[in-house]
Amino acid sequence: MKSNTLHLWHQLCLLLTAVVFIGTTGPLAAASGGRKILALELSADRLTANVTVPAGVESVTVQRFQRDGGWQKVRTKTAVAGVMKFKLPAAGPEIRWRAIGQVVRGTVSHDKFPATFYKGKSRFDAVKSGSRIGAPGILLKDMTGGEGGNLSAPEEADIWKVDGDTVYFFNQLRGLQVLDLADPADPRITASLRLPAVGQDLYLLPGSSKARTVVLLTEGWSNHGGSWTRINLVKVNAGKAEITSTQDVPGSLADSRLAGNRLILATTEWNDYYNATDWSSRSRLSEWLLAADSVPQAAGETLVEGDGPLIASGPDWLALAVNPNGRWDVSDVTVFAIRPNGLIRMARPFRTAGAVTGKFAMQWSGNVLTTISEKNMDESGWSPTTILENFRVWAPEVVRPAVIDPAGDRLGRLKLAKGESLFATRFAGDKAYVVTFLQTDPLFVIDLSDPKDPVVAGHLEVPGWSSHLEPLGDLLFAVGWESETVAASIFDVSNPASPKLLRRVSLGTPGTYSEALWDEQALKVLPHAGLAMIPLSTYDGKTGQSTSVVQLLDIDLTARDLRLRGKISHAFDARRADLIGETVVSISQRVLVAAGVADRDAPAVLSEVTLAWPVDRVLEANGHLLQIEDGGWYGGGGATVRVSPADAPEQILAETDLGEGTVRAADLRDGKLFILREIASTQSVLYWSPVTGKSGANKLALDIYDCQSALAPVLLGSCSLKSGSGAQLAVDHLLWPQPNRPAVVLDYRMSYWYGWDKRQMTDPVVTLSAAARPLKVGIDFQPYGVPEKAPRLILFDTTLPNAPEVGEPVDLGAAGLSLNGVGEAADGRIVIGTYRLNDADFGKAFQSARVVEVESSGLPVIRPLIDLPGELIAVSELDRKGFLAFTQVSGDRSTTLQASACDGFEAFLIDSFHAPAYAAATAGGRRVFVATKAGVERKILGEDGSFHSEPMLDVGYTPDSLRCVGGILIGAKWNALFAADVDGDSVKKWRFPAWNLGLERVIPASNGDLLVPFGDYGAERLKR
């Protein structure tokens, strides 16, 4: 084998030498020079190419790139200076073309040196190579893994980019936001593009004009499990941000890089969720050329079997690691050369001994690929081991022998830290740094100078572990974990054999965490400023409170030390920070904070800009929108109403604090805003208070605000009462039987005891109608969901808005009666859907309705229950004379929908019809709407007492929920919403990135538009 290898190499050397010395028999002769890429322009039909040929080129070769075979010759012609035309074979748009010119070097002169210099031997046999190269290679161009040239590494996407004093932020809660920080004391949002909940990866294309192009990478999903990635090019100019072009790419986004104007996307595609016979997947590495005001142009792609693609890159190389199908314990790594014409695959995929889990665990340098992986299992079971491997990967420009090395492509391997889990890796020159954790918690320094024999140069045992390493010359800055909190460290690695921990500082109390522990882009290290910034959040288990800050750290490269400095407080989890001039700008998804750091021990907050806020309800008042945040312990926000222009929900004009507690209902009537708040003594009042026995202070408060006299609502009056433990609103809105008497209905059912017997413990609450209940401990064997208290009606009197009153709670029935959530009120009457479980037949219930008479003053009158043929789903035409009750009976094979006439005391079945089992249904007026596969089925109740079919509404899907409100039918499925007039045939449809739309809070505006709250993602006004 050895003799064959030498023989082949000898023949190659002879061949190359012969090529070089052709025509050199005389003292002066023409000689071929180097090769150069020539300008090539394809025709529109891609069947011809025009190549611009400069003087000094002797031949032109046109090549095309094949994914499996690399660059292959198509045509070669003798060069003619000017423009040469080549005919091309038919090929798809994904095929790349290039033209190579062979340059005439001119004449070879032997006048430079004495003639005796040129009389020596000029042909040589193969000799043993040096350890770094491994086998001879002739380098045609200096592109061998970052060892030459001034190329910069491809850029990685982030949630924001800072360009001078302008910040571009892809906010998951809102979309693109552009902020001007020329005056840090007065930052301003200058442009925005609503695009929430679809991604956060952003690039800023190079440019210097006022108009800039931002690249936003977003994701979309089909109803059948498929996904795609969308490239959005956004033009930002003159206070506007608008999408100028888009391009969809198959698969979900996993990683990306931007090299100049070439976008490289790594996406994963799974087999069709519903029709797949196997769960195989593949990853797609696609290239796209980007330019302002142009559609992204496809520039090549590579398909790799496997998923979870992970990119590592350097100035002239890119590595892609995937999990091969069916394997999570190893990785397949493919290396590409980055060239002006795109990516060139340099070798077949290499399978690593373990799984590569991070982008800092791969490097290509000096024609060697180095990977660091973790192998978790061996013959004895779980036994994590870190494995470093070196593979031979030649640059495309290197001419090399057919047989590179007798040992194959794998040059060397190093196993270390058996029994330890791999936490951090980083390369710096010919050194690799590795951090593991479990038993001895070491930092390893690995010498890579001999790729065939990587060795541990030294190691240091330290407590805790590091999750990210940042080389700073012969220092190593690290962020990690120790003693249940985030820690920062600085190591001296000037002597690889003896690394030293110079300083470690704890960044918070136990329970502190940081996004930088899993995403190093959250950490900002500025060596030139001697500054590091890291976002921190701390949860206090005793108080239930969370705090968020950006911690400043001094990194003194001269003194080789690390020092803790001041903090910049955030109301919400900070995610990024940077230094703009003398100001630290830090950002969360809710707020941007600018702070002066002249004194790093005491940063001075200069300004705060609100970027996003939750919207749980939207109301329209006097040409404005009232955006209501419910508040509560989760998320850290308080109950607030914010005022915006009716057509610009993101432009907040004023805001009002609604006080403690959580908003449970809100309504706007006659220029007044009515807010129902629940004020709890514990965090989770609705469900756990009967168990904890700590809800004695729970109460409901009704607040009345004037919305006519000022831009911001002004509080007029308030009243409250104790609601009792376990109380929850049975109907999610205020009921108005009289203009001055709003009502709420309370239920006392436990919602979260799935499959458990209910346990009753002490309940010390004193209600308005009874003294303290006696202590009751033990197990109640009532069926699941049976309330322990009777449902109650609470009436308010708002005749005097400055002094509203609350009446005595009224029981709506005996304990054991449950409410189904349906309630309507009008003309002095309230109708509430009720049921009682049938103990003799599990799963069935007696359905009924409770009617309550309410006059403008005095006590309410509770009428007897009205038996209903099914569960109440809607009430229409309600007045003192009666109402129409629409009910349903669900079965395994079909659902029966019914209409009954009620006189206030009895229900008389009018007609019924069958619908698909478990189909969503609702009613409005005398029409019933049912979701089917074909759309929305419509039935109208005629004067003859029968249901009559109307044309089907085609909405394009089967809605999961339907609702009639204000004469409009609305329906939703996942992220899709539609609307149609109850008596109309025209359908308006929308799709959103936010999923599971809650129809109960969608309301019509005065002109018929829909006002939709999206919670954390804000609000939208949908034009109809």
What are these regions (language model features)?
Residues 2-13:
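Bacterial N-terminal signal peptides that target proteins for export
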Residues 96-1024:
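Beta-sheet-rich non-transmembrane sensory/scaffold domains
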Residues 1-2, 30:
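Initiator methionine at the very start of the polypeptide chain
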Residues 30-112:
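Low-complexity, Ser/Thr/Pro-rich intrinsically disordered linker/stalk segments at domain junctions
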Residues 9, 21-22, 29, 53, ...:
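Short intrinsically disordered, low-complexity segments
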